Regions:
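Peripheral, non-catalytic segments that deliver or gate enzyme domains
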Residues: 1-217
């Protein structure tokens, strides 16, 4: 659904093998636009100006998503712009929208590492790296509000910790703890909301949910 609720991007598997076609419907008239984007994967994201879609392109043989493209509504798919291309065949790309809807993240991962890049969601262009890839380092990133990203990471934390960092200086040397690393508690996931977070944690095989403020209290 576009941010102004005037258009819907409908994703259909018409060929099998998880190759999807994206079509656009005008919700005020009920008519389908001429836009048709074939052979996509992993859904799509509306830009906040409601003028474009961002989507992933898979390799037709390996099914690995290797490109993130931008489609301008009303234009032909052949004119879509490549925002990011991953040539390392061990990495699979996935684009997702921040909780604030202000940023689009591109996550490239393999079995032993991952890397995240970001761009503005109003007019996505060049993606900027948050922290370069390193073996055995996994991290996820989100944006809730303001000038900071939140980062869940296993850097110096085998059971993961939750950090924050200024968007202007997102590298790991600038990460400061919201939830510090703990030897006996595994930080499984964190769901982010405007005024609080919900942390799912595991201790001695038991899973608990904990509501915390953005400063970790």
């Amino acid at each position: 659904m576009s941010h102004d609720h005037k258009m819907a991007a409908v994703i259909m598997d018409v060929a099998g093998r998880n190759f999807y076609t994206i079509k656009i419907k005008d919700l005020s008239t009920g008519e389908w636009l001429k836009d048709e984007i074939k052979d996509t994967r992993n859904g799509c994201i509306w830009t906040t100006d409601n003028k474009s879609l961002v989507y992933g392109v898979p390799d037709k043989e390996t099914l690995r998503v290797y490109q993130i493209k931008k489609h301008v509504i009303g234009d032909k798919a052949k004119n879509d712009v490549v925002l990011l291309q991953e040539d390392d065949q061990t990495l699979d790309l996935y684009a997702y929208e921040s909780r604030s809807k202000e940023y689009i993240f591109a996550f490239a991962s393999r079995t032993d590492a991952g890397i995240i890049k970001y761009t503005k969601a109003n007019q996505p262009d060049v993606f900027t790296t948050i922290e370069p890839m390193s073996t055995d380092h996994y991290y996820t990133v989100d944006h809730i509000k303001g000038d900071e990203f939140v980062v869940r990471t296993n850097y110096q934390a085998k059971n993961y910790r939750l950090c924050k960092t200024k968007i202007a200086a997102p590298a790991k040397e600038n990460w400061t703890d919201i939830i510090s690393a703990r030897d006996n508690v595994f930080l499984e996931t964190v769901e982010f909301f405007k005024d609080y977070f919900i942390a799912q944690e595991s201790t001695n095989g038991l899973t608990t949910l904990r509501v915390i403020s953005p400063n970790g209290q």
